[in-house]
Amino acid sequence: MPTEYYIPASAIKALELLRAHGVQMRKTTVATKGLEQFAITANTQRPATNSIDTGSHGLRSLDGTWAATDVTAPIGSFAVAMNQKLARLAFYLLEPKSDDGLTAWNYLDDVLATEGVKSYPILRKK
């Protein structure tokens, strides 16, 4: 499990959902290096269906891998420490391959629905 996740300040819907669930975050005051980034190899948006599981919602799924990156989390990002009471919930919501997380429920579609996007917008520290 990572020690922290870094969420861009522009991911307003995702940040609001994390706050609503009680996940603790802090706004960063320095740029953070030594992170991992998820490289997307497949990005699939399922068509909306009217099912008991998803309502009339089309779930998104990603495939890819985490790898060390030179990308820096800028000042003003939101850090989610994974030594908190709700770490498991945070992990489930923030991991790109989670079947019921922010990606699946389209909370990051401002970035992920863009043609040709190659990287998950949330970074993590091992």
Regions picked out by a protein language model, each given a short descriptive name:
Residues 1-126:
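Intrinsic-disorder/low-complexity accessory segments
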